[in-house]
């Protein structure tokens, strides 16, 4: 079951007078989800205990965001996300040396688990207009739009003991001792908060290229040359090793009103090295430190076709004559 409530612009005045206030730009949304399921035989369905036998829970998501203009040219978007989960069971795990296996101790009741994160995005647009070197006599103009952006996002480490969502035990098997970390709420209808402190700085720059010209009837036409050409990379300030992400490139071409070609490519930031066992593994030195751009590690392409009313008419006429 899903309960969704969109409460955008909750602070806007119904009868505004004068300029818009800063707090009127704040948007608040709420989404609630309830899950309740069980796997059993038909004749045993109503004999099961709602708390012990059913898989159930509830999740609340509340994003709060706003968009402001800074110095007339910069768009600033702060966002705070809050998620809360309600569980009906808590599972504590341990290692039983005699049985040589993991054992569970389940506590039933109401268990509230939450997590939160915050982010801040800043972007602007730079416009350029120029005439191509070829066909100078024709009225052709190229518009280039560059959109640089930077964003900051942060979240605490929810595996920390101060939150009480995670625990660990010592696994002693075949003379090998390992520390196993786990969440009390893993495997339930809603996933628990993920681990690891986050402090991400993301950089992105996108380009759009459009040509404007006059046709034979002196009508102005616009043609998309490059719908989007972008590159992005991020830096995790909380990472102890290898804080840089891979460098990604994306290209989208609108071949017509209905056809779109998309391509993407990824370049690994860190160079390979040999570990103590002679295996090739990603190292801690960047490709840049060796004077290389990056290590190509993947490529993808997709082709999409958008069907509109005109397209449906053409298809129908093709089959019906």
Model-derived features: where do they sit?
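Outer-membrane beta-barrel proteins and related beta-barrel translocases across Gram-negative bacteria
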Residues: 5-321
């Amino acid at each position: 079951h899903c309960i969704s409530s969109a409460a955008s612009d909750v602070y806007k005045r119904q009868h505004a007078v004068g300029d818009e206030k800063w707090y009127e730009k704040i948007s608040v949304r709420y989404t609630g989800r309830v899950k309740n399921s069980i796997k059993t035989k038909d004749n045993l369905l109503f004999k099961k205990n709602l708390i012990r036998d059913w898989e159930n829970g509830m999740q609340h998501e509340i994003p709060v965001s706003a968009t402001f203009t800074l110095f007339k040219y910069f768009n600033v978007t702060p966002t705070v996300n809050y998620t809360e989960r309600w569980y009906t069971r808590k599972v504590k795990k341990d290692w039983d040396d005699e049985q040589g296996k993991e054992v569970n101790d389940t506590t039933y009741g109401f268990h509230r688990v939450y997590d939160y994160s915050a982010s801040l995005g800043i972007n602007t647009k730079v416009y350029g207009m120029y005439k191509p070197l070829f066909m100078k006599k024709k009225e052709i103009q190229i518009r280039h739009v560059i959109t640089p952006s930077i964003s900051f996002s942060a979240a605490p480490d929810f595996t920390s003991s101060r939150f009480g969502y995670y625990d660990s035990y010592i696994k002693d098997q075949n003379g090998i001792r390992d520390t196993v970390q786990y969440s009390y709420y893993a495997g339930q209808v809603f996933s628990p908060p993920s681990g690891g402190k986050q402090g991400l700085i993301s950089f992105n720059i996108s380009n759009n290229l459009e040509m404007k010209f006059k046709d034979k009837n002196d009508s102005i036409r616009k043609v998309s040359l490059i719908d989007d050409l972008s590159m992005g990379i991020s830096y995790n300030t909380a990472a102890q090793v290898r804080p840089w992400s891979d460098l990604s490139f994306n290209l989208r071409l609108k071949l017509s009103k209905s056809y779109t070609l998309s391509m993407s490519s990824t370049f690994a930031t860190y160079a390979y090295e040999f570990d103590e066992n002679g295996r090739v593994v990603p190292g801690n030195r960047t490709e840049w430190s060796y004077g290389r751009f990056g290590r190509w590690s993947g490529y993808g392409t997709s082709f999409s076709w958008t069907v509109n009313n005109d397209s449906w008419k053409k298809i129908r006429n093709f089959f019906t004559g």
